[in-house]
């Protein structure tokens, strides 16, 4: 009976080991050409406990790497390889040496010929196979390149001349892909070679693991034609547009609770809002340099958005009177102002009945300070507000204003703030000297700048939403995402990089679309400090990894819509996931490629990220996952329930 053989060609030792120990089918082939590992690593890989047979190969040896080929194959044999693929391009004396080692270690011998340019004559191929069997091969492998049907017919014509199950003959290239199937279905070839994904094929025309999943393994299929606009981007752009004098057009806007709250704040700042389809026309009337910040009332209502609250607290210092910041729902339970002492250095007094919780009243006048050190451990949102407010501050300083931030978390959100500020003509350059620590930033800028309206600015698609859909595709689907900016400053674009590092079955097309399919996920370690909104996507991905994954940096999750680390663990455990927070403060998740959760009732705790992650987990569960409040997903993606139903092929009543 033919065996599935996973072909792995990577110099990443940990990745190779994870696949060897986690692949649950028949054989894993390690292509040793790129594996410039230490001897101890080769020994460890080929001697490790595993559920599969392990094949060592060095497919294309040349004079330049012949010594490496023989040495690596020898070490693999001595360390416990079950099969060794010895190329006929290796000199005869070295082949005999390798075959002797294999015989002594009980390792099956494959003698192979690979032609990467054409398919030679049938007689030549037949003589080559006969010679390999006479040399002592257990299996002979003849692989050529097909240009058309005649080449395919020629390679498959070898089978009747040799014992069943001992010849592996097929053609590479797209024209030859069908020979791979016919070799096993009609001719009982010993193996069919699969790649982990399309970008990790070892040859053109090779099938991938995805092609051999059962239909029930791929419950999630389809296109996400329009991801929501990034609320992180939209909120910053809306507020900055309201701080201008003149009209800004913001394209590709999609409403969500937090972005709509930003529009209400803009109106409280005196801006006029006109909606033209998915375009926002925002006309601001501020002249902060001459008049200070003008508000319609003494209160700014920010809805449920912590970002808005933290942007508005420093901005309130540009008004000429006390301003009260207030909100609603879960925001009233969140500590929104951890920087009262810092703000006092800039002349602001922040007061409230509950220390640091809304409502808060800001009084005083914002004044620049030449050099201010900031401990950024409480996040970047208030610092973003300071960058905007200080840039617009009409009080001029004789010296440039410096903000020196250390222990910075969510640092990429500061980069996003600076990018959007730049669109509106506000300059906040990094300090030119090298920063030794990625979690340190020094900004310097002049005060008294004027925000200028933008003729046209497109909202970026939301990478937080995209990350969850990409994780869902990698775990159980075939999903295509449209409209993403791969050069985005949004922190959650890191998910794309993680999936590439994971060798996920991911393809980026020329038009920018991204397709991701279920492949083989290996366990991973990830520090979530700078990307706290990725937690749901990471858990979904980890649940389908072949082993234990670890997420650190959970401190950033305690002051979200819920105590996010705690509630994610509680609710995913409620539906059958194996995950826990250890004494070291890290989250450990046990996964399995075929794992099915129990399902059942669970709570979103009013947290839109948790609600969406649990809804995705429904596709990995035996029973329906029933969430008490999926509607809270509207905080960032109102159309999420309908979009997910479309991908699952369900009709919503």
Q: Where in this protein do the model-derived segments appear?
A:
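Short, acidic/polar
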Residues: 9-22, 65-75, 121-131
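Short, well-ordered coil/turn segments that N-cap beta-strands
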Residues: 2-4, 24-26, 50-54, 80-82, ...
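Catalytic beta/alpha-barrel core
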Residues: 7-9, 27-37, 55-65, 81-92, ...
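Short, structured segments at the rim of ligand-binding sites
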Residues: 210-653
């Amino acid at each position: 009976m033919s065996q599935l053989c996973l072909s792995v060609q990577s110099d990443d030792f940990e990745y190779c080991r994870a696949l060897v120990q986690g692949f649950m089918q028949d054989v894993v082939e390690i292509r040793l050409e790129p594996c410039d590992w230490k001897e101890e690593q080769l020994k460890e890989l080929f001697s490790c406990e595993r559920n599969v047979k392990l094949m060592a190969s060095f497919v294309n040896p040349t004079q330049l790497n012949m010594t490496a080929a023989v040495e690596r194959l020898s070490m693999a044999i001595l360390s416990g390889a079950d099969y060794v693929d010895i190329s006929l391009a290796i000199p005869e004396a070295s082949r005999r040496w390798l075959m002797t080692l294999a015989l002594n270690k009980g390792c099956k011998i494959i003698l192979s010929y690979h032609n990467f340019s054409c398919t030679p004559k049938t007689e030549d191929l037949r003589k080559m196979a006969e010679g390999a069997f006479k040399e002592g091969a257990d299996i002979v492998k003849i692989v050529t390149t097909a240009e058309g049907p005649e080449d395919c017919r020629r390679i498959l014509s070898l089978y009747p001349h040799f014992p069943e199950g001992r010849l592996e003959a097929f053609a590479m290239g797209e024209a030859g892909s069908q020979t791979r199937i016919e070799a096993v279905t009609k001719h009982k070839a010993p193996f069919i070679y699969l790649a982990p994904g399309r970008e990790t094929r070892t040859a053109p025309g090779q099938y991938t693991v995805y092609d051999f999943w059962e239909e029930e393994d791929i419950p999630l299929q389809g296109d996400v034609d329009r991801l929501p606009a990034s609320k992180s981007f939209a909120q910053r752009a809306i507020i900055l547009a309201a701080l201008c004098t003149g009209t800004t057009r913001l394209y590709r806007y999609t409403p969500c609770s937090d972005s709509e709250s930003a529009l209400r704040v803009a109106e409280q700042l005196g801006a006029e809002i006109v909606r033209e389809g998915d375009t926002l026309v925002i006309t601001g009337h501020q002249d902060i340099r001459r008049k200070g910040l003008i508000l319609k009332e003494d209160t700014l209502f920010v809805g449920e958005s912590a970002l808005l609250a933290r942007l508005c607290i420093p901005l309130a210092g540009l008004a000429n009177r006390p301003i009260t910041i207030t909100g609603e729902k879960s925001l009233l339970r969140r500590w929104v102002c951890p920087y009262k002492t810092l703000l006092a250095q800039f002349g602001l007094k922040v007061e409230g009945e509950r220390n640091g919780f809304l409502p808060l009243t800001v009084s005083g006048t914002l004044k620049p300070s030449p050099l201010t050190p900031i401990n950024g451990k409480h996040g970047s949102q208030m610092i973003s507000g300071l960058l905007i407010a200080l840039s617009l501050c009409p009080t001029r300083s004789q010296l440039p204003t410096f903000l020196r931030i250390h222990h910075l978390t969510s640092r990429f959100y500061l980069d996003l703030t600076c990018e959007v500020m730049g669109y509106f003509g506000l300059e906040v350059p990094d300090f030119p000297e090298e920063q030794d620590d990625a979690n340190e930033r020094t900004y310097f800028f002049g005060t008294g700048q004027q925000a200028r309206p933008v003729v046209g600015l497109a909202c970026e698609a939301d990478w937080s939403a995209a990350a969850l859909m990409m994780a869902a595709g990698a775990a159980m689907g075939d999903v295509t995402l449209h409209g993403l900016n791969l050069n985005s400053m949004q922190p959650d674009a890191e998910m794309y990089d993680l999936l590439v590092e994971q060798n996920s079955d991911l393809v980026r097309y020329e038009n920018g679309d991204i397709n991701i399919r279920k492949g083989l996920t290996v366990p991973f370690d990830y520090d979530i400090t700078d990307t706290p909104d990725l937690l749901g996507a990471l858990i979904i991905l980890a649940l389908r990894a072949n082993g234990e994954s670890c997420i650190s940096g959970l401190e950033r999750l305690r002051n979200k819509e819920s105590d996010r680390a705690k509630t994610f663990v509680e609710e995913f455990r409620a539906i059958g996931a194996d995950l826990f927070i250890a004494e070291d403060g890290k989250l450990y998740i046990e996964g399995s490629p075929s794992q099915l959760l129990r399902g059942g009732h669970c709570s979103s705790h009013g947290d839109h990220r948790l609600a969406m992650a649990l809804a995705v987990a429904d596709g990995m569960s035996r029973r329906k996952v029933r969430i008490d409040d999926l509607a809270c997903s509207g905080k960032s993606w109102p159309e999420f329930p309908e979009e997910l139903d479309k991908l699952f092929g369900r009709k919503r009543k």
